[in-house]
């Protein structure tokens, strides 16, 4: 069973519910009193009888509310708001008659009291409507702005099921900006207003390292503390140093890119000049690319990509790919070292060819078998017999004599060649056998 004091405390805690304000309207109070009387007379209830504190607070004929004027109601709301008594403010607003409520509905103090009660009752939609549709004095803006932001924070925490960090709160403030009814429209950047930041920038341009008296003077001018002023100057100097270093890196990168492009252009011009005109060292025999001698792949290995500086340091020949001028000097030097060997080989080949051309034809020492057969075919057997020599005509006799002379000369040559061969090789047969075979 609840005592009257406990029930009063519970009712004060239940003031956060939205239905509670409607329950304390004059018509509802009469209904509650009737229900209380019927419940007490008929059947026992789990809860005790309604204490007499409700009629005393909510009855429209109560001397505390019905006899008050509009100014008295406004002053009472202001006093309760200043004291921070939200429960007392809620109970007082519930006892105001509807006629009096309409009279003070547009008053700023009454609107602030309603906004405060809605904020603590978690009626955030009603709170937003009050703050957006009514204009308030600038001296109350900070408190109302805090309620605006805190209401949005609580809504987001309820939706997400977790508390918000500083970054989350910053995003909520950006997503739900304050209405102009509680805000002068001036942006706050880095927790300082734009007017304050402009004044700090002016002092920073004059002296980036202010002494303590200047910090104190600047703090009084901006409404900040000396520590805030010192931190702002420190952070600004650090940002300027970082920006200067970044700009320096960008300038160096642009210069390097420009020099590399100039070098690439000069390299292209140099390569074009080397391909278009012959060098003074090379002989101007043929300017086509097919006659340009190429270096062997073992002397200049292919460079892997990406280029490895340690591999280039280990193999100096790979550095030639980085310097076209050095590459051409090495190329010309290699050609000068290679040209004498090529000239010697060409000279040796030409001497061999000349000797082959100048060599005289060898003298024939023997008649071929075909020639001998042709000679024999021209002489008939009757002409060769000794008995027929007288019957031959003079022309035939002359021909036979010429043939005999040729045969004798051939036989002599054969005998000479056989003798020379037998002198060199004793195994050969005698000259007589050779002559007989040739005959």
UniProtKB/Swiss-Prot annotation:
Residues 264-274, 344-358 have a biased composition (Acidic residues). Expressed in the posterior gonad. Expressed in some cells in the head that are probably neurons. Expressed in the dorsal and ventral neuron RMD pair and the inner labial neuron class IL1. Not expressed in BAG neurons. Disruption phenotype: RNAi-mediated knockdown in hermaphrodite adults causes embryonic and larval lethality and head morphogenesis defects in L1 and L2 larval stages of offspring. InterPro entries: HD (IPR001356), Homeodomain-like_sf (IPR009057), SIX1_SD (IPR031701). It is found in: Nucleus. Residues 379-392 have a biased composition (Polar residues). Transmembrane segments: none annotated. One of its GO terms (cellular component) is nucleus. Keywords: Developmental protein, DNA-binding, Homeobox, Nucleus, Transcription, Transcription regulation. The keyword Cell division does not apply. Residues 183-243 bind DNA. Pfam families: Homeodomain, SIX1_SD. Residues 398-428 have a biased composition (Basic and acidic residues). Residues 253-293, 344-365, 379-439 are annotated as: Disordered. Interacts with gmn-1. This is Homeobox protein ceh-32. It comes from Caenorhabditis elegans. The lineage of its organism: Eukaryota, Metazoa, Ecdysozoa, Nematoda, Chromadorea.
């Amino acid at each position: 069973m609840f005592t009257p004091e406990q029930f009063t405390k519970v009712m004060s805690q239940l003031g956060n519910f939205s239905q509670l304000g409607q329950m304390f309207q004059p018509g509802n109070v009469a209904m509650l009193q009737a229900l209380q009387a019927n419940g007490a007379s008929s059947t026992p209830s789990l809860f005790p009888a309604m204490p007499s504190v409700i009629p005393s607070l909510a009855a429209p004929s109560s001397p505390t509310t019905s006899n008050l004027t509009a100014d008295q109601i406004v002053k009472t709301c202001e006093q309760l708001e200043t004291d921070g008594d939200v429960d007392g403010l809620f109970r007082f607003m519930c006892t105001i008659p509807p006629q009096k409520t309409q009279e003070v509905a547009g008053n700023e103090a009454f609107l602030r009291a309603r906004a405060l009660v809605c904020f603590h009752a978690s009626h955030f939609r009603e709170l937003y409507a009050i703050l957006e549709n009514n204009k308030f004095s600038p001296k109350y803006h900070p408190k109302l702005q805090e309620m605006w932001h805190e209401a949005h924070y609580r809504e987001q925490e309820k939706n997400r099921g977790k508390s918000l960090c500083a970054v989350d709160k910053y995003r909520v403030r950006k997503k739900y900006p304050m209405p102009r009814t509680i805000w002068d429209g001036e942006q706050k950047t880095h927790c300082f207003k734009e007017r304050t930041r402009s004044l700090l920038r002016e002092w920073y341009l004059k002296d980036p390292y202010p002494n303590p008296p200047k910090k104190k003077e600047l703090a009084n001018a901006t409404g900040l503390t000396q520590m805030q002023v010192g931190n702002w100057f420190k952070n600004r100097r650090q940002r300027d140093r970082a920006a200067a270093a970044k700009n320096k890196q960008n300038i160096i990168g642009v210069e390097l890119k420009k020099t590399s492009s100039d070098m690439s252009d000069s390299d292209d011009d140099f390569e074009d000049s080397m391909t278009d005109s012959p060098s003074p060292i090379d002989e101007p025999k043929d300017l086509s690319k097919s006659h340009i001698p190429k270096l062997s792949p073992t002397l200049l290995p292919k460079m892997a990509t990406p280029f490895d500086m340690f591999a280039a340091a280990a193999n100096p020949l790979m550095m030639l790919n980085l310097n076209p001028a050095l590459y051409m000097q090495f190329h010309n030097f290699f050609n000068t070292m290679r040209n004498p060997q090529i000239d010697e080989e060409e000279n040796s080949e030409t001497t061999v060819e000349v000797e082959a051309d100048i060599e005289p034809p060898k003298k024939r020492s023997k008649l071929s078998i075909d020639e001998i057969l042709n000679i024999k075919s021209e002489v008939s057997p009757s002409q060769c017999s000794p008995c027929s020599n007288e019957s031959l005509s003079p022309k035939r006799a002359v021909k036979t004599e010429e043939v005999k002379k040729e045969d004798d000369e051939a036989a002599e040559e054969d005998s000479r060649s056989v003798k020379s061969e037998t002198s060199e090789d004793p195994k050969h047969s005698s000259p007589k056998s050779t002559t007989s075979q040739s005959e």
